[in-house]
C-alpha cells in the first residue's frame, strides 16, 4: 500500500456521476510524474504478476496503469473495452456498476496465446467490472492470478467476494 500523500492526490467529486456517489478520480496522479512512477513501481512488484502471462486492462483508466505496468514488466497487455469499440470475434459480458449497468468485450484472438492474466484497473468499488473480465477469461478457459488497482473503496468490501487476490495501492 502506498503513502497517505498519494491518497491526497486523488480528487473526490460528490454526487458524480449520480446523487449519493462520491467519485474518486485518479487522473490528478498523472500530473505528478515522480509519484506516478512510484505508484507503478508499487503496482508492478505485486506477487500476482509473477505467475501471469499477460495483463488485461479495463476501459478506460485501467489502460493508463496497465500500459505502464506492461512496459515495466515486459508483459503483453490486452484491453477490455466498452461496447462497440473492438473489431473481430469477441467475448462479451454485462456487469453492474454502483450507478448502472454496462458491458465489456475482449478480442478472442488477443488472449489465445496466453493462459494466466492479471486484471488491472484504476479503482475497485463493487467488483463488478473485475468479475465481468474474470468471467470472460474463464469462459475462454483462462486463469486469473489477481486484480491490481490504484484505489480500493474498502467500505464496499468487494475483495471478500472476488475469487482471486486483490492488490490495492490506496484504500479509502
Swiss-Prot record:
Chief subcellular location: cytoplasm
Protein name: Adenine phosphoribosyltransferase
Functional description taken from the UniProt entry: Catalyzes a salvage reaction resulting in the formation of AMP, that is energically less costly than de novo synthesis.
EC numbers on record: 2.4.2.7
One GO BP annotation of this record: purine ribonucleoside salvage
Location(s) in or outside the cell: Cytoplasm
GO molecular function: adenine binding; adenine phosphoribosyltransferase activity; AMP binding
InterPro entries: Ade_phspho_trans, PRibTrfase_dom, PRTase-like, UPRTase/APRTase
Known catalytic reactions: AMP + diphosphate = 5-phospho-alpha-D-ribose 1-diphosphate + adenine
PANTHER family linked to this entry: ADENINE PHOSPHORIBOSYLTRANSFERASE
UniProt similarity note: Belongs to the purine/pyrimidine phosphoribosyltransferase family.
Subunit structure: Homodimer.
Gene name, Swiss-Prot/TrEMBL: apt
Record pathway: Purine metabolism; AMP biosynthesis via salvage pathway; AMP from adenine: step 1/1
Top-level taxon: Bacteria
Keywords per UniProt: Cytoplasm, Glycosyltransferase, Purine salvage, Transferase
Gene Ontology CC: cytoplasm
